[in-house]
């Protein structure tokens, strides 16, 4: 009988690469996505097409309201998503696109689902380029959440172990794209943009788009998605 795994799936290249990696392992896959603001709606739409390429047992889309976390460009309509032209313009501190407690909320949902379905493995697509901008992507955070998960659940108290896997955590965006291309990931079905159009076109100028374009460029590959 296959072990069960919960994967946090955003529709971006990182979590899709994780899905590809896990699909080649001996797991029954349960994917978990979140619809939390109009700006991430195109991500959720992309996932519907993406998920068909994989043997996913179940895909859940959870609607949550993060608009109470004002101050983030990803949840507050009154804040514009910053735009850039080059990677050397990208912020070196925590940007306005940081959403307070987002990964903690997402991982908590994943933990709850894992307990319900009997999974002991949770996968997330954080990586080295996330460390500076997003504190809830750091290795220390992942380890701390795993420790909490094993203290705060029936599974953990009963002596079983829940593991938070971050297979990309020591990889750069460039390395992730290279790995995904080698594995056969169809990146045309992914989206990274923080500020996409209603038609789902990427802006090409937000932090996430610039980082994505740079990663493909460094791999000497044309990014297959459409930009404005």
UniProtKB/Swiss-Prot annotation:
Catalytic activity of the protein: 7-carboxy-7-deazaguanine + NH4(+) + ATP = 7-cyano-7-deazaguanine + ADP + phosphate + H2O + H(+)
GO BP annotations, alphabetical order: queuosine biosynthetic process
Q: From what superkingdom does this record's organism come?
A: Bacteria
The protein's name in its UniProt record? 7-cyano-7-deazaguanine synthase
Q: How is the cofactor bound?
A: Binds 1 zinc ion per subunit.
EC annotation from Swiss-Prot or TrEMBL: 6.3.4.20
ATP-binding keyword on record:
yes
What pathway annotation does it carry? Answer: Purine metabolism; 7-cyano-7-deazaguanine biosynthesis
Protein residues bound to ATP: 9-19
Q: Which residues bind Zn(2+)?
A: 193, 203, 206, 209
**UniProt signal peptide:** none
Report the family membership: Belongs to the QueC family.
| UniProt gene name | queC
Q: Alphabetically list the UniProt keywords.
A: ATP-binding, Ligase, Metal-binding, Nucleotide-binding, Queuosine biosynthesis, Zinc
Q: What does this protein do?
A: Catalyzes the ATP-dependent conversion of 7-carboxy-7-deazaguanine (CDG) to 7-cyano-7-deazaguanine (preQ(0)).
Which cofactor does the UniProt annotation name?
Answer: Zn(2+)
GO molecular function term, any single one: zinc ion binding
